[in-house]
Structures are given as C-alpha cells and as structure tokens.
Regions:
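Juxtamembrane regions of bacterial inner-membrane/periplasmic proteins
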Residues: 2-291, 308-310, 363
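Short loop/turn microsegments at loop-to-beta-strand junctions
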Residues: 42-44, 296-299
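A short, polar/charged loop-to-alpha-helix boundary motif
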Residues: 66-71, 317-331
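Active-site SXXK
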Residues: 81-83, 278, 306-307, 328-360, ...
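Short, well-structured active-site flanking segments
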Residues: 91-100, 173-176, 323, 349-367, ...
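Conserved catalytic neighborhood of penicillin-recognizing serine enzymes
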Residues: 107-134, 247, 251, 255-258, ...
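Glycine-rich, acidic and aromatic/proline-enriched surface loops and short helix-turn segments
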Residues: 126-130, 164-171, 188, 192-204, ...
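Active-site-proximal helix/loop microenvironment
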Residues: 183, 214, 420-429
C-alpha cells in the first residue's frame, strides 16, 4: 500500500483522486438498477356508472385511498400552483436543489422558522421508498436516490408520481383520491379554491387534513389567500370525508372489484336512475308480498339491442342479513325447474313425437324412484300437450323427456353452451 501511494505521489496522480468519487457516483447513477417511482404501488378500484359518476371506491391493497391519475388529467393551473408552492425550480434542478437545502439549514441553525429543503423528486423518493429522513444518513440516501431517479426518468414521470403519492391526511394519498374523497370531483373538476386548499395539505397532512371543523386547515387556506393577493375564490368550501363516499349497486360493484383486485377505474353500463328504480321496486315488491312468504327478490335489466346491463339488484336489501342480502341472487345457482319444460316440448314437436293436441297422461308415476307431484297436489288424467305445458304439469314433461330421440334435453343444453352441467347420468333421464 505504501509503494502504491508513493507511486501516486511521484507521478502526480494524486490530483485525479477527487475525481474518483465523482466517477463512482456517475457509474452508480448510470448502471445501478432504478425502479420506477410507481412500481409496486397499489391503487384503489373505482367503479363508475354510464355517466362517469362513481358507484363505489375501494381501498388499495395497502388500505389506502389512492386513485391512479395521469399528469395529463390534472389541470395545468393546479400543476403550476403545486410547483410554485412546493418546488419552484423543479424543471431546472437535477433532483436536489443545493440552494434550498442551504437556505433551510441556515434557517434551522439560526433558530428561525423550519423550512423544507426537499425537492419534489426527493419527496417522491421518500414516499416511494418509505424513508425516514430525519437522520443525516437517511437524508443523504434520499438525495442520492433523487439524483438517480432524475437520471432514469423524465420530469413529467416524476411529477406524475408525486401527484399519485402525496399524502392528503389519514389513508388518503394522491390528488385523484383527495379530489374524490374531499370534494366528490375529479382533479379536472376542482375549482381554483379547491385546488389551492388541497395543495396545502401534503406539507403537514396530519394537522392540515381537510374538514369543515379543522381550524389549522382553515387558517392555512386563509394565509394562502392573503399571500396570493386574494386570487383564490372566497366561496366556502364544502368538504366531505371517506364516510361520504358512494356505495351504490353493491352486488355488481363487489363482483367487479373481486375480478380487478389490482385496482383501476372501471366504467360500467349501469344507468344510475334505472338502478335506483329497480332497487326501490324490489324493496316495495318484497314488502307487498311478505304476507305470502316472499322475503327476497333479485332483478337484472339488460338493454336488448346492445346486451348491456343497465341495472342489477341482487337482493331486496343488501344490508339485511336475515335474507342473506349480500348474496347476489342474479348469479346464485339454483334449479331451473319448470323453465326447462318449454324446451322439452319444443324438442318433442321438432321430432314429431307430439302436436299441440296430443293427449298426455297426468297420473301418478315413478321415474327411477322419483315420484313427481304437481304444485297443486293433484293429477288431471289425460290432458292435451298444450294444456300440460300451459299448466306446468310435471309427469307429462318427464314422460316426454324420456321419449326424446337425438338430441335429448341434455345434449340440447350442452350444444347451447349451458355452463356447469354435470354428467348426463347425474340427471337420470
């Protein structure tokens, strides 16, 4: 080691030693793997009706309200306001702004007001890597990762990540989720006052969480308005909370969220007005017929020309555990019962086994140990095929099913792509 150091001094290579750390840093920036700022981030599922209004908003896998929002979907005025408030030199620095850091350090050492020296890029690093940056070592790592992030990704990609990760109080992250939760709007629909109010939150999301009765938040909004010479609107803000998020069309929304566990925005063909009419109609129908033992009902409304589902109510009351209201009756498996009888008669007609006036016996009969009865508990003896079908007699239908040639009822259903059929022997006939 002494010989090597002697050669370095003798040849003058010592002058190049300061360049080695810089070269190592450049090599690390260029060659070290750098994950995308939103890689591995989970998002909420948002179900919309056919007008674009939200029906349901779910939590992300890590229990956050976080809605993926593209930078192009955020108004330019809102972007410029955030840059002005958070990082004026975002588009000119390499990820770290030494002047801001120096100014923040001087203010802190001088006992003045604590100032933030972190750039938007540094904030994205802290949020995406879940860093605690209170210690010097962690702050240095944050700065290095910010430089690396700027090396590998564009400014717009980093800014988009910020708008998806910034904290807005509680478990609400990102401007898209904040706009929806607090104002029931998309970012593009926010007023100037609403955008300005949300812009204040990420710097102190605990104390500045938006609510109608948060004095810290109200004071921050007032100070911003004064600082901007009254350019923000003065109309009082109507602020909502997570408890006010919509919970509409619960059965179909639950099904869609189960299918799309990675989140994202899904637009359905549901009509909000028709959906409410169907739900109200089912509740009224079940109430009117409760005396007859009817406790529950389900309905599916399909627009025939387009085959689009316009309304779906899986039960009379989703929240009523007594009727298992959370179970979707439109999807629950159950016996088709008498709905198969017209198919049996149609096949028998096609195969020349009967005509409408063919007499069929409606009398007690056993089919491999099964003794069918009729809904009225009686048998009518000889009846025409037309009358047997019209009055839904069971023995004539089973007799015809046994007489069918090719295709039989089972083969007919299989050709029609009826799902979940068991083997033919399972059904006996």
């Amino acid at each position: 080691m002494k010989i090597l150091w002697s050669k370095i001094r003798r040849t003058g290579l010592w002058a190049a030693l300061p360049a080695i750390p810089l070269a190592a840093l450049l090599a690390w920036l260029f060659f070290a793997p750098c994950r995308a700022p939103l890689e591995g981030v989970s998002f909420s599922g948002v179900i919309l009706d056919n007008t674009g209004a939200p029906l349901r908003v779910s939590l992300s896998r890590d229990q956050k309200y976080r809605i993926h929002t593209r930078l192009t979907d955020i108004p330019r005025a809102a972007v410029e306001a955030v840059l002005r408030y958070e990082d004026r030199h975002f588009y000119s620095h390499p990820g770290v702004n030494p002047f801001s850091l120096f100014r923040a350090a001087l203010s802190m050492l001088g006992g003045g007001r604590r100032m933030g020296g972190s750039t938007i890029t540094m904030q994205v690093v802290r949020l995406s890597h879940n860093l605690e940056t209170g210690k010097p070592g962690a702050k240095l790592r944050q700065m290095l990762l910010a430089l690396q992030l700027e090396w590998h990704f564009s400014k717009d990609e980093i800014l988009e990540a910020y708008f998806n990760l910034a904290p807005y109080g509680g478990n609400i992250e990102g401007l898209g989720a904040a706009a929806l939760v607090y104002f029931h709007k998309t970012p593009a629909q926010l007023t100037q006052a609403e955008s300005a109010a949300l812009m204040l939150v990420p710097q102190n999301p605990v104390k500045r969480r938006p609510s109608q009765d948060n004095p810290v938040f109200a004071a921050a909004v007032k100070r911003l308005d004064q600082a901007w010479s009254g350019r923000t609107e003065h109309a009082p803000l109507r602020i909502y909370g997570p408890q006010d998020l919509p919970f509409e069309a619960p059965h179909i929304c639950a099904e869609l969220l189960e299918r799309h566990r990675d989140g994202g925005v899904l637009r359905t063909t549901l009509s909000p007005t028709l959906q409410k009419r169907v739900e109200g109609g089912l509740r009224a129908f079940a109430s009117r017929n409760a005396a007859y033992g009817l406790k529950n009902a389900a309905a599916l409304v399909v627009h025939w020309p387009s085959m689009e589902i316009r309304a779906l109510a899986g039960s009379a009351d989703f929240h009523d555990a007594r009727i298992s209201g959370e179970i979707d009756g439109t999807r629950a498996r159950r016996s088709p019962g008498s709905t198969l009888k017209p198919l049996i008669y149609a096949l028998a007609l096609d195969q020349g086994i009967i005509h409408p006036h063919t007499l069929l016996l409606d009398t007690p009969r056993s089919f491999a140990g099964y003794d069918p009865e009729n809904f009225d508990g009686s048998f009518r003896g000889p009846v025409s095929a037309a009358e047997a079908l019209r009055s839904s007699r069971n023995v004539p239908a089973l007799t015809l099913a046994a007489r069918l040639k090719h295709p039989g009822l089972y083969e007919f259903l299989r050709r029609a792509d009826v799902e979940f059929l068991s083997g033919e022997e399972h059904y006996g006939l």
